[in-house]
Amino acid sequence: MSIETLVEEIGKLTLTEASELVKALEEKFGVSAAPAIVAGIASAAPAGDAPAQEEKTEFDVVLTSAGESKINVIKVVRALTGLGLKEAKDLVDGAPKTVKEAVSKDEAEKIAKELKDVGAGVELK
């Protein structure tokens, strides 16, 4: 099983299952979750230098253009973000703008698909 597959499977866990996984790993390897987080942050910085997009876990969904159907794009942006009509319109009119920040790959792809389905230009960063 590759690391990427393992990460995807872990991402599918519920919060309760993830908590149980952390406890099981702590017991199995005799470690604490707090130092593991610090180590994860420290090791994430050098990985940024290497061109390895497969390891990226958080994405920003950027609206690059409204396309032909601006009204439908505004409706989708409102549904995705919870913004009011004016705020959603300003976001769409000001493209390129970030619609959602730091979302999982699956969620980012879902959001991008919804926006593309109504004719918007979308980019994942």
From Swiss-Prot:
Pfam families: Ribosomal_L12 (PF00542), Ribosomal_L12_N (PF16320)
CDD domains: Ribosomal_L7_L12
Transmembrane intervals: none
Keywords: Ribonucleoprotein, Ribosomal protein
Residues making up the signal peptide according to the UniProt record: none
Nucleotide-binding among keywords: no
GO term, biological process aspect, one: translation
Gene Ontology MF terms in the entry: mRNA binding; structural constituent of ribosome
Keyword Repeat: no
GO cellular component: cytosolic large ribosomal subunit
Family matches, as SUPFAM superfamilies: ClpS-like, Ribosomal protein L7/12, oligomerisation (N-terminal) domain
HAMAP family with a match to the protein in the record: Ribosomal_bL12 (MF_00368)
Protein purpose: Forms part of the ribosomal stalk which helps the ribosome interact with GTP-bound translation factors. Is thus essential for accurate translation.
PANTHER family (UniProt xref): 39S RIBOSOMAL PROTEIN L12, LARGE RIBOSOMAL SUBUNIT PROTEIN BL12M
Family assignment from sequence similarity: Belongs to the bacterial ribosomal protein bL12 family.
Assembly and binders: Homodimer. Part of the ribosomal stalk of the 50S ribosomal subunit. Forms a multimeric L10(L12)X complex, where L10 forms an elongated spine to which 2 to 4 L12 dimers bind in a sequential fashion. Binds GTP-bound translation factors.
The name this protein goes by in its record: Large ribosomal subunit protein bL12
Encoding gene (name): rplL
